[in-house]
Amino acid sequence: MAHEKLWGGRFSEPTDQFVEEFTASIDFDKRLYHQDIRGSIAHARMLGKQGILPMAEVEKIVAGLQEVLARIEAGKFDFSVALEDIHMNIEARLTEKIGEAGKRLHTGRSRNDQVALDIRLYLRDEIVEISAYLDMLVDSLIYQAEANLGVIMPGYTHLQTAQPILFSHHMMAYVEMFTRDKGRMEDCLRRMNVLPLGAGALAGTTFPIDREHVAELLDFPGVTRNSLDSVSDRDFALEFMGASSILMMHLSRFSEELILWSTSEFKFVELTDSFCTGSSIMPQKKNPDVPELVRGKTGRVYGNLMALLTVMKALPLAYNKDMQEDKEPLFDTIDTVKGSLKIFADMVREMRINAGNMRAAAAKGFSTATDVADYLVRQGMPFRDAHEVVGKTVAYCIANGKDLPDLTMDEWQGFSDKIGEDIFDAITLEASVNARVATGGTALERVKAEIERAKVGR
């Protein structure tokens, strides 16, 4: 069905069909329908309150918008490319239903401030949902940390065995990361949560509107302070996408570790069958597709951020059609982050830990060598000298096919006469782990305290 353009008065020729299709955004911005209608209802009520529209017309507008909303949610709304976007589709349908009053709804506003409002409302809701998914993932990490207290694994630097740590300590490291991610989301929400409606196209409006009343109706604590900035600003979307990129980086690092840990070479964890797939040719395969996909999707989120940064980097104030390109990368980022968090929260809770393999790996690679150096320092030796002594001890062990616990007392004292029988107690895995009692350390009591602190902070 052909639709007359709601802005067509200045034009004498119809829009080229390909131009119409090329410039339309309805295929992707239709997901903003609920926010668009909610914003329009608040705007209409304000127009009535201010005497700009008669209350009888306001009630017709509100009832009509609610009917449009019900029709969309029932899947009975025909979106039209000819009407370009969600705003015009809804307004045109409203006017068809209620007549002249529908044409008055747009009094005192522009699509420029209207879309700025819609995106903020939408993203505000999505950030709340993403924060809930972050809470679910943190809960799963805490669950694994509590369920596996005392399990010792190797800690790595450069992916080489470094020092023994608690598996629970490793899980709590990710609790810290995802807690920071939630904080970044909350910071983004705080800066974003102001009402742009009322800025008009760019300069404000000549009508005696009450922006603060609209803000109250839409649960915004305040309004934007400059009309040009209100319609030009996409910082809030960029900030969200930046925070999402960091969040996905954390998920990607975790994914890489789970992929490694689930290999036959590590065998530290087993992902349950419901989160893995098989091979079309190799019947023995159990592939960690979920963490692999999350790792891959991280680049997609980075790309979305770069895409929007590039769109915005040279735009003069105020609105430009380029800014229509904000929605697809934003929506894709939202969908990717939500999906990744939801599946990760479930997968982490259900994964199985192989404590025996973790402990066996922690006992290899001279993981307690630093403890020998610390032992010598406590006997009065300068740390650099202790480092040299232990380095030579490790070299001797490698040459002779031994590990540190295999050395005899005579061999130990051949490297330093400061070493006594108590060295053997100092280099057990438990002694190494539990010696690290400073705040942030991997000692069992310290990790228990951090788990409780994280639970209280939920």
Swiss-Prot record:
Chemical reaction(s) catalysed: 2-(N(omega)-L-arginino)succinate = fumarate + L-arginine
Record-listed E.C. numbers: 4.3.2.1
Keyword list, A-Z: Amino-acid biosynthesis, Arginine biosynthesis, Cytoplasm, Lyase
GO terms under biological process: arginine biosynthetic process via ornithine; L-arginine biosynthetic process
Pathway of action: Amino-acid biosynthesis; L-arginine biosynthesis; L-arginine from L-ornithine and carbamoyl phosphate: step 3/3
InterPro entries: Arg_succ_lyase_C, Argininosuccinate_lyase, Fumarase/histidase_N, Fumarate_lyase_CS, Fumarate_lyase_fam, Fumarate_lyase_N, L-Aspartase-like
Top-rank taxon: Bacteria
Gene Ontology molecular function: any one: argininosuccinate lyase activity
Listed NCBIfam families: argH (TIGR00838)
Protein name, as recorded: Argininosuccinate lyase
